[in-house]
């Protein structure tokens, strides 16, 4: 195999969710369809590199900063949803369940991975809350050890502020069967049950 092709496969393997076989298939597909797919792929990647940037307010990725969400006058500017990653923001937007603004942390606290409060956008979040513009913070971190640790850290950091804090509910997903749920999910669902 040509060294340049090998190098491209190795590079593709670094992308999330791609192993050696998937990387090989993608590279081979791009090279086989160079006139239709490869050229368009290269042009699009170049355009993204030149035009896409992080929103100075929330951390979203768009061609303008502030992003369209932060610029929108139709959204609640005083309700901010805190998420770990941009993909979480995109998922919430796709669901259409939040009409406020966002704050992307760029990860979750993890001693194992060396992710500390200083490497996340927590200080920037503190400044947003301290400005008085935020009345409610919806902490929408993942239901993982790291996500919950991050959520608790944010609560501690914001103690004493006037901002209302809330967490997303956790528990049994819609459409799931009890037999397929793990003990942790069932435990959370029972602990957070509500009266009807």
UniProtKB/Swiss-Prot annotation:
UniProt xrefs under SMART domains: TOPRIM
Residue span, Toprim domain: 78-173
The GO molecular function terms of this record are:
DNA binding; zinc ion binding
Residue spans annotated as Zn fingers (C4-type) read: 55-70
**Disulfide bonds, paired cysteine numbers:** none
Top-level taxon of origin? Bacteria
User: What's one GO BP annotation on this UniProt entry?
Assistant: DNA repair
- Keywords attached to this entry: DNA damage, DNA recombination, DNA repair, Metal-binding, Zinc, Zinc-finger
Which SUPFAM superfamilies does this one have? Recombination protein RecR
Q: Which family does it belong to?
A: Belongs to the RecR family.
Q: What does this protein do?
A: May play a role in DNA repair. It seems to be involved in an RecBC-independent recombinational process of DNA repair. It may act with RecF and RecO.
For this protein, the record's NCBIfam families field holds: recR
Protein known as: Recombination protein RecR
Q: What is the lineage of its organism?
A: Bacteria, Pseudomonadati, Pseudomonadota, Alphaproteobacteria, Rickettsiales
